[in-house]
Regions:
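Residues on the lipid-exposed face of transmembrane beta-strands in outer-membrane beta-barrel proteins
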Residues: 104, 150-154, 233-237
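Outer-membrane beta-barrel domain signature, strongest for Gram-negative TonB-dependent receptors
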Residues: 170-255
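Substrate-binding clefts and substrate-entry loops adjacent to catalytic sites
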Residues: 123-138, 142, 206-214
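Outer-membrane beta-barrel channels and translocator barrels
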Residues: 107-109, 157-159, 240-242
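Residue-level detector of the transmembrane beta-barrel scaffold of outer-membrane proteins
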Residues: 52, 82, 112-116, 162-164, ...
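Transmembrane beta-barrel strands of outer-membrane/channel proteins
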Residues: 117-123, 165-169, 247-251
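Short sequence motifs at beta-strands and strand-loop junctions characteristic
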Residues: 94-96, 140-145, 223-227, 239
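Periplasmic N-terminal accessory/gating domains of Gram-negative outer-membrane beta-barrel systems
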Residues: 1-108, 127, 133-136, 149-151, ...
């Protein structure tokens, strides 16, 4: 086939061998010589890139950040068979972007039943204490992520009908506000301690509740949990030598 510009093909073996802490698709696209940070290619803003899954667009249409849709991957990296990164191709079938284009192809079932189950976990204690020989001082920000998932694929009718499913769930406990009030009015930025006294914060909270009936709730170091759930199902039907049908359903929920 005639080339329509610079392209990098990324195989399943490449995807498996690339180290990725965040399990992000953008970590894999860096295998392209033009790949930069996030979805940036050849120096262009990441929001000008185009991302497709099996030919369907999955773009950040609102455009306030360079993240993939939903603030993360629309599908699990374990559901991807191969990828291609193209840089401003002149193929008329690939349009509506001026930076790079990422084409992801999802896995499909075969005549052999295959499956996997996995758990990934990371937290702030897995980080080192030194950067370029300098010790990192201060309180360590909470950075935890636990991911559970599975894949399963195989034949429904041998040589004719196949299925593949993938489900993944991630939990990310965070802290909405790390700053705390001080006891003596002395601030300590490294420990996230404000110069505002705890007793003053308590007085303000009590005043607002008595005057307006409004409960301020906690004003210091209170937690929140983010979650991400992905599900993908695909069915492939070999109708005959000239006709094939593929149906794919995917669902993503961020909270």
């Amino acid at each position: 086939a005639q080339k329509m510009g610079s392209a990098t093909n990324i195989s399943s073996a490449d995807i498996i061998s690339v180290p990725t802490v965040s399990r992000s698709i953008s970590d894999v696209t860096r295998l392209s010589p033009y790949g930069g940070n996030g979805m940036s290619f050849a120096g262009a803003d990441g929001r000008t890139a185009n991302f497709t899954v099996d030919g369907a667009n999955f773009n950040n249409n609102f455009g306030l950040s360079d993240n993939l849709p939903g603030g993360g991957n629309p599908i699990s990296i374990d559901a991807i068979e191969e990828m291609q990164v193209v840089i401003s191709p002149y193929d008329v079938r690939q349009t509506n972007f001026i930076g790079g284009g990422v084409n992801a192809i999802t896995k499909s079932g075969t005549n052999t039943f295959k499956g996997s189950a996995y758990v990934y976990h990371r937290n702030e204690n897995m980080r080192g204490n030194f950067v370029a020989g300098q010790e990192v001082a201060g309180a360590r920000d909470k950075d935890r992520n636990t991911t559970y998932g599975f894949t399963l694929g195989g034949p429904i009718v041998k040589d004719k009908l196949f299925f593949f499913v993938n489900a993944e769930y991630s939990t990310i406990p965070t802290v909405v506000n790390r700053w705390r009030g001080s006891v003596d009015g002395e601030a300590n930025a490294d420990a996230y301690i404000s110069r505002t006294k705890l007793e003053d914060l308590q007085k303000v909270s009590e005043f607002v509740k008595e005057k307006y009936g409004y409960d301020t709730g906690s004003w210091t170091d209170y937690p929140a949990t983010e979650s991400n759930m992905k599900f993908l199902a695909r069915i492939d039907w070999n109708i005959n030598d000239n006709h094939k049908l593929a149906l794919r359903y995917n669902y993503t929920l961020n909270q």
